Amino acid sequence: MTWFRKPPAPATAGDLLFRAIETWQGEAPWGRVLDAGTGEHSLGWLVGRPTRAWTAVTGDPTRQQSLRTAFSTRMRPVDRVVDGDWADPGLLRGEVFDVVLADYLLGALDGFAPYFQDRLLSRLRPHVAGRLYLVGLEPYADPAPDEAGAIIVELARLRDAAILLAGDRCYREYPHTWVLRQLRQAGFQVVNTEVVPIVYSRRFIDGQLDVARRKLPRFRDPGVAAAMGQAIEALRGRAHAVHDRLGGLRVGADYVIEARPVGG
């Protein structure tokens, strides 16, 4: 089964999220780090940190191999990319890390372990010796409050329709207020939070619609696939026009949270 993960926010937003983590970490040693839901974006940032060792987990064997290849020259003998499912109690059993990063992991989890989201933070808790940094996306407001929001919601609906018609699962994002409650229930103390507004670019628009287009060959009905292809390009034109007129699509926000184990 394949899945879709939201592409990284525009560089300025992504930089701000990771910059917040770097600021909160300060002079504290990074030590052993776990990237609990890895990808090129998070791992590309992580390999630039002064870690003693890192472990990166992905639920996709294909991605595991591609990441090993992409980062082969930057991996030390102590670094590893692991294929695993957090619903598996044996995954990294007994291992503890100084820092754990969960970069958009909650949103992506539905593709690997549906209905496990409310247990994820408790599952990660035994692996966190020092700090947990969690990055997420606020769910889009629906109905949207303005024109930019309406375009983003329409993009998300069309993309998700294509994903479902291809037989795959969509991601599901959770608001930071829900995450804060779950962290406290899982035995964490929330230390810092930051919310970063998003300005979506043409690149984001095209990325979302290209995800939908790549699903078309797997539609069972060629007629539905053809109609979806036309809808994709029609929406691309309208979204580009709104983007250009507004100077970007200012919609929603990403958030980053620092938490530490209670009593840790």
Whereabouts are the PLM-identified features?
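A short acidic, Gly/Pro-enriched loop at the edge of an enzyme's catalytic core
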Residues: 90-100
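A short, conserved alpha-helix within the catalytic core of class I
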Residues: 108-127, 134-136
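C-terminal helical/coil "lid" or tail adjacent to the Rossmann-like core of SAM-dependent
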Residues: 197-245
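Short alpha-helix
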Residues: 169-187
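Conserved S-adenosyl-L-methionine
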Residues: 188-199
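Class I SAM-dependent methyltransferase Rossmann-like catalytic core
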Residues: 1-30
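Class I SAM-dependent methyltransferase SAM/SAH-binding core
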Residues: 32-92
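Conserved class I S-adenosyl-L-methionine
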Residues: 131-159
